[in-house]
């Protein structure tokens, strides 16, 4: 599912769209099914330590004005898949696997976009912290071509992951 927004603002003024969608997904699933999912980084949603959904946010800017004119947010969510290929079976999952879904795709989509539009920005980091898969765990990341390892200690007020590195 995708949504096309036209914010027409400077980059610094953009709402944290990816975080907004991630929070909306985990809250919608919890509300409609009682199933607890988690946020890894900010663009991946996990269920039972396996990836269930991914979020991709792309922005288009105007060279003349320097403003972000368009934002497209795409969400891939495994809704009801019972069998994954062998190479994905240990790392991917679906909201519903062998059981019959208790909700429809349309119900879930509707709830996600409703929450996307209504979760207060001030609550986004709180949801991310509550649903984080990585806080207090060892993580590895790359920055400027160098690989770092450390422990994810905190999520900043703009959704950034703060890591205490080994060096």
Question: For the regions a protein language model found, what residue spans apply to each?
Answer:
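Primarily the active-site beta-strand->alpha-helix module of PP2C/PPM metal-dependent phosphatases
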Residues: 1-6, 16-19
């Amino acid at each position: 599912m995708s949504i096309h927004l036209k914010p027409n603002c400077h980059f610094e003024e953009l709402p944290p769209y990816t975080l907004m969608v991630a929070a909306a997904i985990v809250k919608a699933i919890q509300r409609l099914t009682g199933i607890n999912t988690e946020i890894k980084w900010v663009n991946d949603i996990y269920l039972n330590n396996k990836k269930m959904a991914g979020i991709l946010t792309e922005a288009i800017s105007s060279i003349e004005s320097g403003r972000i004119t368009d934002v497209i947010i795409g969400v891939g969510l495994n809704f009801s898949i019972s069998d994954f290929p062998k190479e994905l079976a240990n790392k991917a999952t679906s909201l519903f696997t062998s059981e019959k879904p208790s909700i429809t795709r349309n119900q879930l989509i509707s709830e996600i976009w409703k929450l996307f539009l209504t979760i207060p920005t001030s609550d986004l980091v709180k949801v991310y912290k509550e649903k984080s898969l990585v806080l207090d765990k060892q993580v590895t990341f790359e920055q400027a071509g160098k690989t770092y390892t450390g422990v994810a200690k905190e999520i900043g007020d703009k959704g950034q992951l703060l890591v205490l590195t080994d060096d």
